[in-house]
A protein has these predicted regions:
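TM-lumen/periplasm interface segments of multi-pass membrane proteins
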Residues: 9-122, 140
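Membrane-embedded alpha-helical segments of multi-pass membrane proteins
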Residues: 100-108, 149-154, 179-185
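Membrane-interface helix-boundary motifs at transmembrane edges
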Residues: 114-123, 164-167, 193-201
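Short helix- or helix-capping micro-motifs
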Residues: 127-133, 176, 180
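Short acidic/glycine- and proline-prone juxtamembrane loop motifs at membrane-interface regions
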Residues: 140-148
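Membrane-interface transmembrane helices that cradle and orient dolichyl/undecaprenyl
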Residues: 150, 155-170
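Membrane-interface alpha helices of multi-pass inner-membrane proteins
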Residues: 169-194
């Protein structure tokens, strides 16, 4: 009797961990923010729309800080490097990016839960579903299509070791720096690194 190849076991585990919260997120997204539609599926991912319009204007040589979105009339308020990092959003249908963005936020959420000690496998999947349904900041981040959960995952990955003892691939501080160039708020953790004596990570 042969054992299941490790990559197959890992794929099944990821499916159990990610698919339930992703499916629940997709189901509730049209109802989180006003003017969403359950069918055809059209959530009001307002912030994601801002990112897409800003990137398209950047590639067209326009001022991204003058970019506004239709109906909501919102502006891009992130550092310019954030628009550069979001360049792929200019290509492909918006519906595709709504799904990809939601999947990315769910992956980030599950990564944080795992590093905070939630057991892997179906328990992580169920906790992820509960977080999507019950934790308002996570739910609205998904509904607006914001970047906050991804930035949180970067910072947490810098601060907390992997629960399974996975070796750190990047020097401590790199992911916090990346989060800070996308949105300035995570820069507070640079100060935190200084305060706990990790000056190298802060720099």
């Amino acid at each position: 009797m042969t054992s299941t190849p490790s990559w197959q076991a890992q794929a099944r585990r990821l499916l159990v961990e990610l698919l339930p919260p992703f499916a629940v997120a997709c189901a509730i997204l049209p109802f989180v923010i006003a003017h969403g539609k359950p069918w055809p599926w059209q959530p009001s991912t307002i912030d994601l729309q801002v990112y897409v319009y800003a990137v398209k204007d950047m590639l067209a040589g326009k001022d991204i800080f003058a970019t506004t979105t239709p109906f909501w009339n919102l502006y891009f308020i992130y550092p310019p490097i954030a628009a550069v990092l979001m360049t792929p959003l200019a290509f492909g249908p918006y519906l595709m990016w709504q799904l990809v963005w939601t999947a990315g936020l769910i992956w980030a959420q599950q990564s944080v839960l795992r590093r905070c000690g939630v057991p892997r496998g179906w328990k992580l999947g169920l906790v992820g579903v509960a977080v999507v349904l019950a934790v308002e900041p996570i739910r609205t981040t998904l509904g607006y299509g914001q970047v906050n959960t991804l930035l949180m995952a970067f910072v947490v990955a810098d601060l907390l070791p992997d629960a399974e003892g996975e070796r750190r691939r990047l020097p401590q501080g790199v992911l916090t720096g990346l989060a800070t160039v996308i949105k300035l708020t995570p820069g507070l953790f640079v100060v935190f690194f200084f305060l706990i004596g990790k000056k190298r990570a802060a720099l």
